[in-house]
């Protein structure tokens, strides 16, 4: 997508009791083949029949599926997405159809990057896509979503559409003038978190009625690039950015009951071994295995939090982004460091099936997309990584 996409990718990278770790044998976990093409900043979901669907991001308009119940598991290409290439969409299965919400991309080769508020759905039976006659109440990029039931999805977080779009309009206007471009970049990043107006409203979309509902607000500031999971009517909203380059280590917890969201006591991710504080993560993988919430990977800027505390709003200036390989687990109500992944990785797709958490694609420590598929499983108190 040219220079604007390069600036977008650069900017978005600024915006996703120790237990033993073991490499599993084939008897412990499912082995899945690599995705046909590398995937980062994509999206994915699993249906009620154990079929995983992933696509978009660096895969462009391509989508693939794999049936976990088949003896011989292979990725199959499905019909391409009609809404154009985009990154950071959210997808869930509702009423046996795959819904895709928002994202960021270019409407044509000449236009600047922009936030989308559209919704598409895919029918596995017909292998067809359809644009849904609705738009989200706010533009959706950097948002997160979890399925509440067969008809409803909860969506929250994300960047402010107008502020985000204006940044790329200004970058495009600067064109080849490096001095002007650097000025735009500095002015964009050198602001306090509150000035970015990240979305803190919680929206509920009902696919059966094709309606949106305001379900309240996050208990604190809005975030972008958070990870989220839902288990037994309890929502966990994990870390994310408070502003580009600055993460939070907070995990919000809420209960969904009688169509109402009640916020409970939050918690914090512990520091990594050898580090004084937890910077927080964006683009992390997450999912449950045998009742343990596992969070791994993602990326941050070590030292940005201290800079911000000291009054430096451009908190990540001069700091190299660090992709993470640590895995944490919420065991008996307490967060613990569990061990390390096979490699630092973030901004991929997390999908849970049974007691396995699949980590599909992602971005490695060189900023490159990968096509690998790995998994987390808890067994006998150990974290198994395959």
From Swiss-Prot:
The keyword Signal applies. Its EC number is 5.1.3.24. InterPro entries: Kelch-typ_b-propeller (IPR015915), NANM (IPR056734), NanM_proteobact (IPR019936). The keyword rRNA-binding does not apply. Residues 1-29 form the signal peptide. It comes from the Bacteria. It is found in: Periplasm. The active site is at 241 (proton acceptor). It catalyses: N-acetyl-alpha-neuraminate = N-acetyl-beta-neuraminate. Kelch repeats lie at residues 51-95, 97-149, 151-186, 187-232, 235-284, 306-355, 357-386. One of its GO terms (molecular function) is racemase and epimerase activity, acting on carbohydrates and derivatives. GO terms for cellular component: periplasmic space. Keywords: Carbohydrate metabolism, Isomerase, Kelch repeat, Periplasm, Repeat, Signal. Belongs to the NanM family. Homodimer. Converts alpha-N-acetylneuranimic acid (Neu5Ac) to the beta-anomer, accelerating the equilibrium between the alpha- and beta-anomers. Probably facilitates sialidase-negative bacteria to compete successfully for limited amounts of extracellular Neu5Ac, which is likely taken up in the beta-anomer. In addition, the rapid removal of sialic acid from solution might be advantageous to the bacterium to damp down host responses. This is N-acetylneuraminate epimerase. It comes from Salmonella paratyphi B (strain ATCC BAA-1250 / SPB7).
């Amino acid at each position: 997508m040219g220079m604007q996409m390069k600036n977008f990718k650069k900017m978005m990278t600024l915006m996703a009791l120790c237990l033993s770790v073991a490499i599993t044998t084939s008897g412990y976990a499912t082995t899945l083949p690599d995705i046909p093409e590398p995937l980062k900043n994509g999206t994915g979901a699993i249906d009620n029949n154990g079929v995983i669907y992933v696509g978009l991001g660096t895969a462009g308009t391509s989508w693939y599926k794999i049936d976990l119940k088949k003896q011989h598991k292979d990725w199959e290409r499905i019909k391409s997405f009609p809404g154009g290439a985009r990154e950071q969409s959210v997808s869930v299965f509702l009423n046996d159809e795959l819904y895709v919400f928002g994202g960021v991309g270019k409407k044509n080769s000449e236009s600047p990057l922009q936030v989308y508020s559209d919704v598409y759905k895919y029918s596995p039976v017909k292998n067809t896509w359809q644009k849904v006659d609705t738009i989200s109440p706010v533009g959706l990029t950097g948002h997160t979503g979890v399925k509440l039931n067969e008809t409803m999805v909860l969506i929250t977080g994300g960047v402010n559409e107008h502020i985000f779009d204006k940044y790329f309009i200004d970058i495009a206007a600067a064109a080849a003038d490096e001095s002007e471009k650097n000025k735009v970049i500095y002015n964009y990043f050198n602001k306090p978190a509150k000035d970015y107006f990240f979305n803190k409203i919680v929206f509920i979309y009902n696919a059966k009625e094709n309606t949106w509902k305001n379900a309240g607000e996050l208990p604190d500031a809005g975030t972008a690039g958070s990870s989220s999971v839902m288990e037994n009517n309890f929502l966990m909203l994990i870390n994310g950015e408070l502003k580009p380059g600055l993460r939070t280590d907070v995990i919000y917890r809420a209960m969904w009951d009688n169509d109402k969201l009640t916020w409970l006591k939050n918690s914090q991710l512990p520091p990594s071994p050898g580090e004084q504080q937890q910077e927080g993560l964006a683009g992390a993988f997450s999912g449950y295995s045998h009742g343990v919430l596992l969070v791994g990977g993602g990326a941050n800027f070590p030292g940005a939090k201290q800079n911000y505390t000291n009054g430096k709003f451009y908190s990540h200036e001069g700091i190299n982004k660090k992709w993470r390989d640590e895995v944490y687990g919420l065991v008996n109500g307490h967060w613990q460091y569990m061990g390390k992944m096979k490699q630092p990785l973030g901004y991929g797709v997390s999908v849970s099936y049974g007691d396995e958490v699949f980590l599909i694609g992602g971005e490695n420590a060189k900023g490159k997309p990968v096509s690998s598929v790995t998994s987390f499983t808890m067994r006998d108190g150990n974290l198994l990584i395959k």
